[in-house]
Each structure stands twice: as C-alpha cells, then as structure tokens.
Amino acid sequence: FGSLLGICLLTQIITGLLLATHYTADTTLAFSSVAHTCRNVQYGWLIRNLQANGASFFFICIYLHIGRGFYYGSYLFKETWNTGVILLLTLMATAFVGYVLPWRQMSFWGATVITNLFSALPYIGQTIVEWAWGGFSVDNPTLTRFFALHFLLPFLIAGLTLIHFTFLHESGSNNPLGIMSDCDKIPFHPYFSVKDILGFMFMLLPLTTLALFSPNLLGDPENFTPANPLVTPPHIKPEWYFLFAYAILRSIPNKLGGVLALAASVLVLFLAPFLHTSKQRTMAFRPLSQFLFWMLVANLLILTWVGS
C-alpha cells in the first residue's frame, strides 16, 4: 500500500496544482471559481473529480497501510512507525483545510465546528481560535490562510515521506512472517515494479470509475449550496474518512473530554511499539490477537457508520 500512497500523493499534487491555477481564495469568489473550473476549463470537471475522490482513496490506502502494519507488527520499526503517524496527522490536516476551500455549506460549518474545538483548551483556547480564524468568525482571512496551508502541506508530506523511506531502508522492510527479509533483496525492476503496477491498476480503475460515473457519491449534498453563516445545516458532519473520530467526539458530552478523546483516537498509534509484549512479531500465529485486531476493525467501521 506504500507504493499506492505514493501514487495518491503524486496524483493529488498534480491535480491540486492544476486546480490552484483556476482557484480564487476569496469568500465572494471561491464557490463560483470552483464552478467555473468545472464548467469552463478544459477537463476541469475531471481534474476536480479526481482530486475530490483521490482524497478518499488516499485515506482508504493509508488506513489499509496502517492496519497491515498493525497486523504484521511493523510498528517495531519505531522510527518508521512514528514518522508514519506524523504523516497521517499531516494528511488529516491537509484534507481538513482543503475541504474548506470551495466555501460551501458543509465546508464552512465543518471549519467552524472543528476549529472551534481548540477553544476547549483551558486559558489559551479562545486566543488560539481567534488567531487561527484571523478574526471573530470563519471569514476571508481564514479562507486565505487555509489555502496557503493546503498548498504547502502536500510538499511537507512529500518531504516526510522521504524521511519515512530513509528510516525504512535502515532496517529493511517487514514481511508477513516477521522474519529476516534478506531473501527479498532482489532487483527492484522488473520484480517490484511489476508488482506495484498491478496495485496501481487495482487502485486507479475504481478511482477513475468513481470520478467518471458517480463523482458525488461520497460527498455531502449540502455542498451544492454556497456557504451561508446565517443558516446552519441540520446535521454537521465531516467527510466519511473522519467519521470514526467525529463519532467519538460527539459521543462525549463534555467539550474538552470529547476533544481529548478525538485526539487520543489517532495519537494512540504512537503507543503501539510500547504495548507489544509477544515473543512473535506478527499476528499470523496468534489467534487471540487476531480476534482483537478484527474487533478493532469492526469497531472503527461501526463508529464510521454511527458518525454519519
């Protein structure tokens, strides 16, 4: 899945650059500039659909990548694992600020709700929120800085990916049996390159199918309406890939408690290397651990469903 994530990142950066050339980071023009891109720019609709649905595939791949690492004990490469978790956090931040850019109903209210969570921090919370907003509400300054961040962060992700690679090459990669990988040290081309191309085909086929046939399947219908600060949508919710965390946030009646639980739901990944007690590295021969792992997967799926 690592190679697929690389392709995702490349696709997102290319489509994103093309979209940025037609985008206007201004509250009065953002929505219509996106509509203009879809209607009047050659293949603008395709570029936008690939960008929007590419994000979904990026998260599908990263969740599978993390799950696979969890199952096969890859977290014992501590540096590789920790840089990976930092990559996940950066990706989540990038997706969040990018979601706000078209300045639609759910974008606007999602940004308002999520940035407002920082106000739960004691003493400094309110100041941080107003500083992030650039005022007393989500408005033009917020949109401008979110665009700047959304442009910058993917390149930070690319840089972190190289660090991730460097640490991985220190140790060599893991395998399903959790034993030495020396026998896998074969020429990259044609062996691994052909294996990767198969993966690319398996990912790019559903991505193009989704982008061409039902590009709005995973989106929110509220997003066809331009942002209106005076009308709150009946239920505010993020994109599907954040629903598990959002469900955890919403299930706790206390604001600070919810924020801490939301943060913990992702940051708990940092603890994985310290919680490994087994003599065996992978779960391949540990039925009880396998059971707990699949319980975790089921739990996340149920949270995603409940969150919507």
Curated annotation (Swiss-Prot):
For this chain's record, the cofactor binding note is: Binds 2 heme b groups non-covalently.
Residue positions annotated to bind heme b b562 are H150
Q: What does this protein do?
A: Component of the ubiquinol-cytochrome c reductase complex (complex III or cytochrome b-c1 complex) that is part of the mitochondrial respiratory chain. The b-c1 complex mediates electron transfer from ubiquinol to cytochrome c. Contributes to the generation of a proton gradient across the mitochondrial membrane that is then used for ATP synthesis.
Q: Which SUPFAM superfamilies match?
A: a domain/subunit of cytochrome bc1 complex (Ubiquinol-cytochrome c reductase), Transmembrane di-heme cytochromes
What are the BP-aspect GO terms?
Answer: mitochondrial electron transport, ubiquinol to cytochrome c
Q: Which UniProt keywords apply?
A: Electron transport, Heme, Iron, Membrane, Metal-binding, Mitochondrion, Mitochondrion inner membrane, Respiratory chain, Transmembrane, Transmembrane helix, Transport, Ubiquinone
Q: Give the binding site residues for a ubiquinone.
A: H169
Q: Which metal ions or organic cofactors does this protein require, according to UniProt?
A: heme b
Give the subcellular location.
Mitochondrion inner membrane
- Topological type in the membrane: Multi-pass membrane protein
Q: Which Pfam families match?
A: Cytochrom_B_C (PF00032), Cytochrome_B (PF00033)
Q: Does the keyword Zinc apply?
A: no
List the GO molecular function terms: metal ion binding; ubiquinol-cytochrome-c reductase activity
A single Gene Ontology CC annotation of this entry is: mitochondrial inner membrane
What name does this protein carry? Cytochrome b
The miscellaneous annotation reads: Heme 1 (or BL or b562) is low-potential and absorbs at about 562 nm, and heme 2 (or BH or b566) is high-potential and absorbs at about 566 nm.
Subunit note: The cytochrome bc1 complex contains 11 subunits: 3 respiratory subunits (MT-CYB, CYC1 and UQCRFS1), 2 core proteins (UQCRC1 and UQCRC2) and 6 low-molecular weight proteins (UQCRH/QCR6, UQCRB/QCR7, UQCRQ/QCR8, UQCR10/QCR9, UQCR11/QCR10 and a cleavage product of UQCRFS1). This cytochrome bc1 complex then forms a dimer.
Transmembrane annotation, as ranges: 1-21, 45-66, 81-101, 146-166, 194-214, 256-276, 288-308
Residues binding heme b b566 are H65, H164
Name the family.
Belongs to the cytochrome b family.
Tagged with keyword Kinase: no
